[in-house]
Amino acid sequence: MNAWEVNFDGLVGLTHHYAGLSFGNKASTRHRFQVSNPRLAAKQGLLKMKTLADAGFPQAVIPPHERPFIPVLRQLGFSGSDEQVLEKVVRQAPHWLSSVSSASPMWVANAATIAPSADTLDGKVHLTVANLNNKFHRSLEAPVTESLLKAIFNDEEKFSVHSALPQVALLGDEGAANHNRLGGHYGEPGMQLFVYGREEGNDTRPSRYPARQTREASEAVARLNQVNPQQVIFAQQNPDVIDQGVFHNDVIAVSNRQVLFCHQQAFARQSQLLANLRARVNGFMAIEVPATQVSVSDAVSTYLFNSQLLSRDDGSMMLVLPQECREHAGVWGYLNELLAADNPISELKVFDLRESMANGGGPACLRLRVVLTQEERRAVNPAVMMNDTLFNALNDWVDRYYRDRLTAADLADPQLLREGREALDVLSQLLNLGSVYPFQREGGGNG
């Protein structure tokens, strides 16, 4: 059956700032306390979406979350009106404010893990929300992510959205950022590659930085998504590269159809894994980048592998890269050799995503890939699909509500909270989402 990969990109939120919250993510740590530009960040993301949509790649949008997230501050013992809660946090424990104001939901590669209908036992598209247990600021995302996905994939005959796994370290799950799908045409059954960093009883694990994904979580997600057991491979990421800043597999590998583009040191027992994929995926092609040409350090600093590998109708592929790749002579030299070599990659497309990159999120972090048949595409909430009208409406919305300068101190401003809620109220109507945010359901307005 014919099917297409639709990229659902996260829209950057109004509180996008640099707080260095993500230990193990070198860019996040390095840019801590810098001044951010939320308006520019949102527009950089929107331009990527629109450019790819105009080039014929189906594209949709996932909205930001409510931030600062007052309900969690109340859980932590701060009481009073919303303004009083903010004021008490600033006075008593200001470190919490940045965590509950993070715009990290924009990196929707961590929103969920997807199983297309061609791979599932019941013939539905399955989406399992990620619990993001390893980082407090990200663990807050799951309930609203679930509400958003249910509002977008709202036809229960075709889509099953599963709640996140229990919030414990044993079941740490980071979503599609640790998941690849390999195969022929999108509509054919594919091989799902789940990548984990640690498992109980296995001493092979990183020592410097945390392994955020467990094998136990990956196995549970595969079960929830009803993936045919014959179409699953579990592989461990190389713990040495996690210790060098590769906190998700999509920082060291990316797949599309029959191609796996990865670093030579991406996986534990890599030659064994690639042999297994060759045996099980027709026409499988591994493009392994040697460490002698691109070091792990350079891969992390440029986000070479946090790229999007997109298929054209003629079978050729386009590699979508951040500008940092073009600015690194060694990486750009390698990429031009790649273009000239015998493989499906025939074009490089570069985007300026500096605002997201400075927090450790490249092109692949910003998108959730969902393979859909024509019938399934028609069943998706049409208001989220990118086109000229939506692009212009979202650009105007960003101009109206987003600040062009934000520091950590600004997060305490009650006006920022009010601006954010008003903006999300308008956006949820624009995207026909219903009341997906807690502040809408509580009926508390902006007070």
Curated annotation (Swiss-Prot):
The active site is at E174, H248, C365 (nucleophile). It is an enzyme of class 3 (hydrolase). GO terms for biological process: arginine catabolic process to glutamate; arginine catabolic process to succinate. The keyword Hydrolase applies. One of its GO terms (molecular function) is N-succinylarginine dihydrolase activity. It comes from the Bacteria. Keywords: Arginine metabolism, Hydrolase. It holds the Pfam family AstB. Gene3D superfamilies: Succinylarginine dihydrolase (3.75.10.20). It catalyses: N(2)-succinyl-L-arginine + 2 H2O + 2 H(+) = N(2)-succinyl-L-ornithine + 2 NH4(+) + CO2. Its EC number is 3.5.3.23. Substrate binds at residues 19-28, 110, 137-138, 212, 250, 359. Homodimer. Belongs to the succinylarginine dihydrolase family. Catalyzes the hydrolysis of N(2)-succinylarginine into N(2)-succinylornithine, ammonia and CO(2). HAMAP family: AstB (MF_01172). This is N-succinylarginine dihydrolase.
